[in-house]
Amino acid sequence: MMLPNFGEAAQKRLKSATVLVTGVGGLGGTAALYLAVAGVGRLILVRGGDLRLDDMNRQVLMTDDWVGKPRVFKAKETLQAINPDIQIETIHDYITSENVDSLVQSADMALDCAHNFTERDLLNSACVRWRKPMVEAAMDGMEAYLTTIIPGVTPCLSCIFPEKPDWDRRGFSVLGAVSGTLACLTALEAIKLITGFSQPLLSQLLTIDLNRMEFAKRRLYRDRSCPVCGNDAPWRYAQSNSMETSSNCTHS
């Protein structure tokens, strides 16, 4: 590939990496697609529930005949048709307190594309506990948000949102082009983390207003009293202080 700082070593890092993707929809599914075509060796796709017709405006991995069926299985089928060499594990379930630790331990990093804060908080806490990087991506309407979390280095999700925003169980409105835009940036952050070829978005929140096509970055700071990643957080005692971020992810 003729891209500065992206050579054979970077491609090998992608091949040896395992990425956990939560929420295989317009955001997570599209991000998974770009990781698959980039050459990531293994994906763990996590999403409960079945595909609905009103999901289809943003589902690039799905087909109409799959409505009413578990989307993770169709996602695997589509991704492996595009990249037959990729390994894909499918979990037809949501992120729960029972499964989150084993899932995070099985991956080198996570993409948080879940559709509610309950799952997001569980994933954030587990990534902090096990020192796994996480790309945090969210959207609502024509707005999108992105940051990359490195436990012990950057603020975690709980630092950024100590009080959780209201969540409408009916879901939220979004155009497929919005979720696709954010998904590409999410996949790019993951590729940066895995390969180290470029600086990821650390301790900064990228906000995107796609109505006005305005992109802005806001500096983020760790909360030393954060119950998840702060100085007195339980993970500091549950895990060895010498634990390092996965060798398959690199950052400066």
Swiss-Prot record:
What UniProt keywords are attached to this protein's entry? Answer: Nitrogen fixation
The record's Pfam families line, in alphabetical order, gives: ThiF (PF00899)
Q: Which domain of life is it from?
A: Bacteria
PANTHER family cross-referenced by the UniProt entry: ADENYLYLTRANSFERASE AND SULFURTRANSFERASE MOCS3, UBIQUITIN-ACTIVATING ENZYME E1
What is the protein name given in its UniProt record?
Protein HesA
Its annotated function is as follows: May be required for efficient nitrogen fixation.
Name the source organism: Nostoc sp. (strain PCC 7120 / SAG 25.82 / UTEX 2576)
Q: What biological-process terms (Gene Ontology) are attached?
A: nitrogen fixation
Q: Which family does it belong to?
A: Belongs to the HesA/MoeB/ThiF family.
This protein's record includes keyword Signal:
no
Q: Which GO terms describe its cellular component?
A: cytoplasm
Task: State any single GO MF term.
Answer: nucleotidyltransferase activity
